[in-house]
């Protein structure tokens, strides 16, 4: 069996794993509109050929450690009626399990395939600009094939580079004393890229976005996507704030919520968390915290 870990946004530009022979595909949907939240929670996914559906384990238990270093087990994946019967299912999935997947789904519906491709192109374009800026210095870029992430072997005075990064309020991922990794996303601005290039090379960068994907893209040309995706009607209808708001309202009208009745069964997340407790989750001090920040 071939198992492939992948990135949903990258797959808008790159061939999907199924087209290159993958049997099982895993990944996270976090970058589809879900804040980093200091590492979670995020909705992961595991997909396989329909012929393997009945061979998948009904439960996957993950082993971890608690704050005291003790072995701890948690339910990482469970198969429910809704995963098998889909729209024919008659039972519900707890909010805490479905909420993050719903958020990622709405993000995909709002942007649609064209919007997601635009976001992916913008992310890759800025990564290419960063690549060119670093390549022109004496640092060595480890990976010449990339979508949004560069691994860089630094040369020169590393302590000076760290100081420039600190002065610019930039944190990057340090693997060791001279090997770093930088990932770009849709929240990264051209100013951020310019500051990164200057901090790493001490060279100012100008005309950052005057760069075409046709000049030197980091994607393998043989791996570019040609097939369509997200062909269902709902991914092509709700691309304005008003349309999206009304669509979500129509869906919510089909459900039982605290604004119209008590919730006698299930949805423990909604029963136990008041609005005043849930509001801070959206604060940038919580939502925008990167899991690797010091």
Question: Across the structure, where does each feature detected by a protein language model lie?
Answer:
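Conserved PLP-binding catalytic core of the aspartate aminotransferase-like
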Residues: 124, 137-166, 184-187
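Conserved phosphate/anionic-ligand binding catalytic regions in large, soluble enzymes, centered on
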Residues: 34-47, 51-52, 96-100, 183, ...
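Pre-Walker A segment
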Residues: 285-294
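Flexible inter-domain linker/hinge segments
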Residues: 190-264, 268-276, 281-285
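Active-site C-terminal subdomain of aminotransferase-like
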Residues: 32-137, 142-144
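Conserved PLP phosphate-binding loop immediately N-terminal to the Schiff-base lysine helix
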Residues: 1-36
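Noncatalytic alpha-helical scaffolds and linker/capping helices
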Residues: 167, 175-199
């Amino acid at each position: 069996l071939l198992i492939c870990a992948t990135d949903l946004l990258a797959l808008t530009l790159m061939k999907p794993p199924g087209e290159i022979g993958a049997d099982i595909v895993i990944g996270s949907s976090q970058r589809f509109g879900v804040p980093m939240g200091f590492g979670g929670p995020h909705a992961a996914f595991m997909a396989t050929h329909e012929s393997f559906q009945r061979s998948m384990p009904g439960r996957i238990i993950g082993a971890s450690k608690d704050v005291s270093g003790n072995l701890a087990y948690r339910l990482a994946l469970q198969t429910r009626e809704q995963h098998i019967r889909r729209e024919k299912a008659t039972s519900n999935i707890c909010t805490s399990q479905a909420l993050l997947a719903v958020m990622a789904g709405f993000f995909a519906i709002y942007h649609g395939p064209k919007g997601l491709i635009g976001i992916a192109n913008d992310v890759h374009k800025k990564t290419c600009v960063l690549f060119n800026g670093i390549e022109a210095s004496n640092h060595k870029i480890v990976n010449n094939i990339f979508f949004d992430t560069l691994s860089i072997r630094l040369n020169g005075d590393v302590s000076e580079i760290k100081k420039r990064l600190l002065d610019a309020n930039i944190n990057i991922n340090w693997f060791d004393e001279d090997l770093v990794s930088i990932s770009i996303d849709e929240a990264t601005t051209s100013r951020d890229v310019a500051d990164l290039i200057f901090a790493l090379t001490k060279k100012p960068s100008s005309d950052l976005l005057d760069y075409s994907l046709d000049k030197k893209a980091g994607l393998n040309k043989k791996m570019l996507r040609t097939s369509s995706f997200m062909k269902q009607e709902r991914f092509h209808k709700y691309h304005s704030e008003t349309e999206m708001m009304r669509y979500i309202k129509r869906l919510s009208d089909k459900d039982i919520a605290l604004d119209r009745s008590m919730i006698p069964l299930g949805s423990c997340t909604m029963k136990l968390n008041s609005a005043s407790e849930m509001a801070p989750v959206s604060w940038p001090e919580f939502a925008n915290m990167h899991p690797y920040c010091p």
